[in-house]
Amino acid sequence: MVNPQFASNFYFDQRLNTEAVKLLPGEYFVTTRNMVLSTVLGSCVSACIYDGQSGVGGMNHFMLPRGEDDQGLQVECARFGGYAMDILIRELLRNGAHKENLVSKVFGGGNVQRAMVSSMIGSQNTRFVKKYLAERGIPILAADLEGNHPRKIHFFPKNGRVLQKKLYVSRNDTIVEREQNYSRLLLSVAQSAIQPGTREN
């Protein structure tokens, strides 16, 4: 059975002349193939982690640092940073990466929404991803975090190359609306009691 959180939006990028996968919030992707992983980030964060020696790399796209149920257990949903980072690293190792070779590049965490709580989410995501990687000894080779603009990211997992474009437009309603809707949903999940034996997918 395919993990529903594993990105499956494949396309061919004409400009970059390569196979590509677009990641949506709550998705991740790991590959050994010569391709590009792309996403658009507002207050969300993406970690691009790879082993340059083994040629294995992957990326995630998470919206909030952590989600816990009423028992204090981590909600297994890749829209939350704790699980998104854990599963990304686990899949990298399962596909042949070596932990001592892993390095990262991180992006996002922008203050693109009007509400103060949304600005806090971007900063919280930024602090979380830096702390997570530091605690696990995974160096951050490059980072572009926070700020006031959304970002479009193209990550080449075979060699770690990243292309970033900041979206300097006056109205980013699609990105903002999507993140607001997901943020409300995730905050509701994190704060409500989840019945024992159930899982958020």
Curated annotation (Swiss-Prot):
Sorted UniProt keywords: Chemotaxis, Hydrolase
Record bears the keyword Hydrolase: yes
MF GO annotations: protein-glutamine glutaminase activity
Gene Ontology biological-process entries: chemotaxis
Catalytic activity: L-glutaminyl-[protein] + H2O = L-glutamyl-[protein] + NH4(+)
InterPro entries listed in its UniProt record: CheD-like_sf (IPR038592), Chemorcpt_Glu_NH3ase_CheD (IPR005659), Cytotoxic_necrot_fac-like_cat (IPR011324)
Pfam families (UniProt xref): CheD
Domain of life: Bacteria
Cystine bridges: none
EC number: 3.5.1.44
PANTHER family assigned: CHEMORECEPTOR GLUTAMINE DEAMIDASE CHED-RELATED
Function: Probably deamidates glutamine residues to glutamate on methyl-accepting chemotaxis receptors (MCPs), playing an important role in chemotaxis.
HAMAP family: CheD (MF_01440)
Sequence similarity: Belongs to the CheD family.
UniProt protein name: Probable chemoreceptor glutamine deamidase CheD
Organism encoding this protein: Nitrosomonas europaea (strain ATCC 19718 / CIP 103999 / KCTC 2705 / NBRC 14298)
Protein's gene: cheD
